[in-house]
From Swiss-Prot:
One of its GO terms (biological process) is ubiquinone biosynthetic process. CDD domains: PT_UbiA_COQ2 (cd13959). The lineage of its organism: Bacteria, Pseudomonadati, Pseudomonadota, Gammaproteobacteria, Alteromonadales. Its EC number is 2.5.1.39. The gene is ubiA. It is a multi-pass membrane protein. It comes from Pseudoalteromonas atlantica (strain T6c / ATCC BAA-1087). This is 4-hydroxybenzoate octaprenyltransferase. It is found in: Cell inner membrane.
Length: 285
């Protein structure tokens, strides 16, 4: 296999842009710590961390495969490997299958209930890229895909998925819709021209307002979770930091400039980190 194809695989997997993996990792760590009420078993943590990278990579590959006919019409994506021809469609599908196979091998080291749940993750990752052709809410499907590690984490650690796991899952879906709408605002003009659907297209001039309401809902639900679980001050400091970051993001997207919207999207890495540190502070301080 040529070096150019390997480089194309690297780009298809977005290995050069790790923020997507971080956005998937943080909620996974939230769930693992809450499920274990502290430090989760190392082997389970390692499996989930590896699984985050592998499944995010698989999702990016199948996303580019689904978008191969339209990416050439969008400024931001017209140089992607499938568009440029560096990687063929067959090679992309082979890479996707390989990554899914690796992810399945990882999950085989967990209990059978988690293995069954993992099928939901595969289904969500596979259908998400095609949703933008049929609905304005592909971001909701992405939120479910990014959040599916939460019930899996609880099942792996406790062999059950309690109500608080689904509460945390809902928080993650709302957060994902908010930040992926910011991401979709970058491509909105191109999407309108080629008929691609997204929440950014649907929300239109109300995008900032709805993103703000989603972010407010995330904060309120986090506070409710903290009260329910009896979290200490450090968690609330983390939520406060996340709230400040949300306000900063609102300022960034105020003019709807492409680069500013993308910067707001990237800033969500620190939101996830702040919440993770808040949860860790409760359990370890």
């Amino acid at each position: 296999m040529s070096r150019s194809v390997l480089q194309g695989f690297w780009l298809l997997m977005r290995a050069d842009k790790p923020v997507g993996s971080y956005l998937l990792l943080w909620p996974t760590l939230w769930a693992l710590m809450i499920a274990a009420q502290g430090l989760p078993p190392w082997h389970i943590t390692g499996i989930f961390m590896a699984g985050v990278f592998v499944m995010r990579s698989a999702g990016c590959v199948i996303n580019d495969y689904a978008d191969r006919k339209v990416d050439g019409k969008v400024d931001r994506t017209k140089a992607r490997p499938l568009v440029s021809g560096v990687v063929t469609e067959k090679q992309a599908l082979g890479l996707f299958a390989t990554l899914v196979g690796v992810a399945f091998l990882l999950v085989l080291a967990l209990n059978w209930q988690t293995i069954v749940l993992s099928l939901g993750a595969l289904a969500l990752a596979s259908v998400y890229p095609f949703m933008k052709r049929y609905t304005h809410f592909p971001q909701v499907v992405l939120g479910a895909a990014f959040g599916w590690a939460i019930p899996m984490a609880f099942m792996a650690v406790t062999e059950a998925v309690p109500a608080i796991a689904w509460w945390l899952f809902a928080i993650n879906v709302l957060w994902t819709v908010a930040y992926d709408t910011q991401y979709a605002m970058v491509d909105r003009n191109d999407d309108l021209q080629i008929g691609v659907k997204s929440t950014a297209v649907l929300f239109g001039q109300y995008d900032r307002l709805i993103i703000g309401l989603l972010q407010l809902s995330v904060v309120v639900m986090l506070l409710g979770m903290g009260q329910y679980l009896g979290f200490t001050l450090s968690f609330y400091v983390g939520v406060l930091l996340a709230s400040v970051l949300f306000i900063h993001q609102q300022r960034l997207i105020s003019g709807r400039a492409r680069q500013a919207c993308f910067s707001a999207f990237l800033n969500n890495n620190y939101v996830g980190m702040a919440i993770a540190l808040g949860i860790a502070g409760h359990y370890f301080m």
